[in-house]
UniProtKB/Swiss-Prot annotation:
Homohexamer; trimer of dimers. It catalyses: 2-dehydro-3,6-dideoxy-6-sulfo-D-gluconate = (2S)-3-sulfolactaldehyde + pyruvate. Its cofactor is a divalent metal cation. Its EC number is 4.1.2.58. Catalyzes the retro-aldol cleavage of 2-dehydro-3,6-dideoxy-6-sulfo-D-gluconate to (2S)-3-sulfolactaldehyde and pyruvate. Is involved in a degradation pathway of sulfoquinovose (SQ) that allows P.putida SQ1 to use SQ as the sole carbon and energy source for growth. This is 2-dehydro-3,6-dideoxy-6-sulfogluconate aldolase. The keyword Kinase does not apply.
């Protein structure tokens, strides 16, 4: 996913719906993030969602609920080619995430021969090729993580970073307000530092204008909104037009 020439554009999947995932893939998004951190998506759901996404040409990213080797192993065994790990704050945690994603000798991922990722055992070289065919993306979501950005990025096997404006604004005392000047300054600082070390970094924003500004700064890939945010926005637009009611003020700033 990270080798595309133009900045890949994605969105968040919060609905646990394979049909929605498939539709958004056909809509033209380059990648779709399945959020298992904030949504009660089970691994059986993930199985069907990945099948739906991979029919469309979009790339799946699975954000697991925690930096846990079992959760990462199951997402990879189900066939996700990209995983995102939340709340990584230092090099030790980064090494743990990479280890869980990679087979020995690079890591400690448990091996099974027959699962969806190996095409149920028909991909004879899967075990040898898997370490090069999956991406490990680590989330930078706190001031501590930002302070340790270079040491996190320097861990072998880290393919990209992803800045989380929502949690960053929350832990820095500006909950629900990633547009605060202090947070925007951190966002700008992160891309400058990532450019300096050659590490791709992504980000999420709630509007095309905001996402466009991030891409202009040099963010390598970005997500805009989410399936649920898009549905609520369109529903409100239709109800305002047809019923003349005042649309409720949106509280979500990204997804």
């Amino acid at each position: 996913m990270l080798k595309r020439q133009s900045a890949p554009l994605g969105t968040w999947l919060m609905s646990a719906s394979a049909s929605t995932a498939e539709a958004l893939g056909y809509a033209g998004f380059d990648w779709l993030l399945v959020d298992m951190e904030h949504v009660p998506i089970e691994f059986r759901d993930l199985w069907h969602i990945l099948q739906a996404i991979q029919c469309t040409g979009a790339q799946p990213i699975v954000r697991v609920a925690a930096n846990d080797p079992v959760l990462l192993k199951r997402a990879l065994d189900l066939g996700s080619t990209n995983v995102m790990v939340p709340f990584v704050e230092n090099a030790e945690q980064a090494r743990a995430a990479v280890s869980a994603v990679k087979y020995p000798p690079m890591g400690t991922r448990g091996f099974a021969a027959v699962h969806r990722a190996s095409r149920y055992g028909t991909w004879k070289g899967y075990g040898q090729q898997a370490n090069d065919s999956v991406s490990c993306i680590l989330q930078i979501e706190t001031a501590t993580a930002l302070a340790n950005l270079e040491e996190i990025a320097a861990v072998p096997g880290v393919d990209a970073l992803f800045l989380g404006p929502g949690d960053l604004s929350s832990v820095c005392g500006h909950i629900g307000n990633p547009a605060h000047p202090d947070i925007q300054a951190m966002i700008s600082d992160a891309i400058v530092r990532c450019k300096a070390i050659g590490m791709p970094i992504g980000i999420v924003g709630g509007t095309p204008e905001l996402v466009g500004s991030y891409l202009e700064q040099g963010y390598a890939f970005a997500a805009v909104a989410s399936d649920m945010a898009m549905m609520m926005s369109k529903a409100n637009e239709l109800l305002v037009a047809l019923k003349g009611r005042q649309a409720p003020e949106a509280v979500a700033t990204a997804y």
